Amino acid sequence: MISRREFVLAASAAIGVVGAAPPLLGWGANESPAIPGKHGMIVRSLRFLDLEMPVEYANSLITPVEHFFIRNHMHEPSTLDLGEWRLSIGGEVEKPLTLTLAALTKMEHHTIVNTLECAGNGRAFAVPHVPGVRWEKGAVGTARFSGPRLRDVLERAGVRSTGKHVMFRGLDEVPGKVPAFIRSIPIEKATDGDTLLAVHMNGAALTKHHGFPARALVPGWIGAASCKWLTEIKVLDKEFEGNFMSPGYRMPNQPVKPGETVKVEDTHPATALNVKSLIASPRDGANVKSRAMHVQGLAWAGEADIAKVEVSTDSGATWQPAQLGKEQSHYTWRLWSYSWNAPKTGAYTIMSRATDTHGRMQPDSVQWNPSGYLINVVDRVQIHVQA
């Protein structure tokens, strides 16, 4: 077995935290300790390492790896022998396979630019509060993921007609009696040509934090679908039955009142992301020294595309169209900007809302659910114009 340090080198600078797992810091924001390869991130938890991107980094089409959020449900693998690592493909298939990293590397690769977002991004704004990591706005990022199509690997194995779901298991180190992080996706999504077994991120090998040596990439869906550190893919005759499929990562079938309990049988799996926008500049609480300013941000919509973004500078009384950036790609956020001259000095609430090509528009208030998933309320920042 290789050490963590050797693992880091083998992963092309796949950087990890060396030593015993630090104590849990809690769900709130903490002053960031020195985490190699993750400059300036907001620490939500050090127990399993959950890091959030500050909104000021949300200013480009592609998020640098050092600023890409991290969501871990368990401990990251502490050691990995690349000579022994294998990815098995089995279950409802004719020819079970075992693949090495070299075999995956030799297959035809495809690249998908994808906005990856944790289902719980925005959970901190749910009232009443709900359990879970208290993400605010930055559990989201966009990267270029490359690797073989999952469909091509499944075709090699020969999926039987009984295959309905595809299960992913990673090498997460499970503490005690905690259930393993295992999830599945419908065969239709698994065999979509854009679903990948990613081995590269932004042109380099995946880092340890982001799933080296291989991860699933399920574009347009919640981040939990794109399992990291893959070691097993299994074709099932039905949805996987496990903690992170049920009761975990499920949405109510009908809107519920804040604080209301929902039975599991009245829920469905969380899948595609909602339409959403984010104001990156000016920052919330900023003292702006000029009445003339550029409001800038990002908008994304999962499997849909962004149709428009609107901005309000009067707390939502009126809305004006923002200018969308020229760069656009399916599954990918869109940059937007709005030029504004404040009529006078004083306090202002600036808001943004996006509408996608499916006709969905961000709601004015939080659509509460017991897990705080897929919250996409219009974004707001409060500023003070001093000039």
Where are these regions (language model features)?
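C-terminal segment of classical bacterial N-terminal signal peptides
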Residues: A20-P23
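N-terminal secretory signal peptides and thylakoid transit peptides that target proteins
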Residues: M1-I15
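Structured, non-membrane catalytic/scaffold regions adjacent to prosthetic-group chemistry
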Residues: W27-A387
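Residue-level detector of alpha-helical transmembrane segments in integral membrane proteins
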Residues: I15-G16, R47
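A generic secondary-structure boundary signal that marks alpha-helix termini
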Residues: G16-V17, V159
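Compositionally biased amphipathic helical and low-complexity segments enriched in hydrophobic
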Residues: A10, L25-G26
